Amino acid sequence: MKGIEKLKEGYPLLNKLIATEEVFWVNPNMEKYETAIKDSPLSEENVKDAEERLKRFASYIAKVFPETKETKGIIESPLLKIPSMKQALEKHYKQPILGELLLKCDSHLPISGSIKARGGIYEVLKHAEQLALQHGMLTEEDDYSILDSDTCREFFAKYSIAVGSTGNLGLSIGIMSAKLGFNVTVHMSADAKQWKKDLLRSKGVNVIEYEADYSKAVKEGRQQADTDPSCYFVDDENSHDLFLGYAVAASRLQKQLEELEIVVDEEHPLFVYLPCGVGGGPGGVAFGLKLLYKDNVHCFFAEPTHSPCMLLGLMTGLHDKIAVQDIGIDNVTDADGLAVGRPSGFVGKTMEPFLSGNYTVSDEELYRLLKELADTENIYLEPSALAGMIGPVKVCKEDAYLQEQQLMKEMKKGTHIVWGTGGSMVPEDVINGYYKTGERLTI
């Protein structure tokens, strides 16, 4: 790896990053959609395939998770207008936000209460389908609700699934795998919240805890799977399936925007702000949106000031060859789902030509935003889920991107979507604690 001083010379923004100051970075490597898609390892067909698979599983999901009955087994979340929060942001930051502000409430996705219910559940279902098809338990024409049987559960019990997680991915993989009958182990990093570990154990999931960070938990999970041929490892750092499970969100969002009569085209740009840890969730969603809206959607990743792994990897072009610890950042943040020191090389390289930019936000700011959203809209999220909320302020304030893309004229007719990634399953006492922290920091 290049020496840190050399890197600082080439990338002056690194000094602020190392000082854990909030930064806003415009991606100089973004390309026009038509150019970017030519070199992409994934395509629209891959996303459509994932979408079809989720439809095949819908009857099973509706049967085993009654909370999805209303949506007929499709795991989806609301898209809400948040005008009071918009006013509060404008007032607090003394910055007008041009265009409408909405919140995508993946915090309230059924089954596991976070964005990870998309990718995590999809990858487990795909693995289950492959096993069941291989062993003649199922054909693609069957009603997949037949998987809810003792025979199928006994069959899946011969196999195991492992994953390394800071929390939310572990919840989605653990809950789904256990429901199907798999033996499942979640390797959890030091920053994983206790309630998440307790919930998993209550579902019969084997939780292994580590004193180290996320990368160590993933490494241990990978090693466990390597020694056991019947064990399937969900690789958060490199998984195409996780990524595609997240990408399906885009066509669902498109329908919701149409229902709200919100237009997305050249004169009505769409801005989407996605909290980013290792990168799979935000990367998949952004990729799906790019397939649909091409150059009319502008995606920004949001990271904690103490864990800016994707920004560091993208800015230096080193991707997973550099970790925040290499430049003296501690990777300690209350935004547990984003506490990742080394980004996914697969996601970074795949998204580099599509991504508009990246910014960081402090833990203190996350708590203040958490309290503000609760006060103005009565919506409670976990700290990491608020990382996107400051995005519209940053984009409008640091208008270099808008000038460069010649968007200033269109902004009033634009739409901002903040992706609320998790929070509905957080126990009440924990949420109250978060709120009190926000209160203390606001005074």
Swiss-Prot record:
Keywords: Lyase, Pyridoxal phosphate
UniProt keyword Ribonucleoprotein, yes or no: no
EC number assigned by the record: 4.3.1.18
SUPFAM superfamilies in the cross-refs: Tryptophan synthase beta subunit-like PLP-dependent enzymes
GO biological process: D-serine catabolic process; isoleucine biosynthetic process
Pfam (any one): PALP
Catalytic activities: D-serine = pyruvate + NH4(+)
Gene Ontology terms for molecular function: D-serine ammonia-lyase activity; hydro-lyase activity; pyridoxal phosphate binding
Coiled coil: none
Modified residues (N6-(pyridoxal phosphate)lysine): K116
Cofactor(s) this protein cannot do without: pyridoxal 5'-phosphate
Transmembrane segments: none
The UniProt record lists the keyword Lyase: yes
Family per record: Belongs to the serine/threonine dehydratase family. DsdA subfamily.
HAMAP family: D_Ser_dehydrat (MF_01030)
NCBIfam families membership: D_Ser_am_lyase, PRK02991.1
Protein name, UniProt field: Probable D-serine dehydratase
Organism of origin: Bacillus cereus (strain AH187)
Lineage: Bacteria, Bacillati, Bacillota, Bacilli, Bacillales
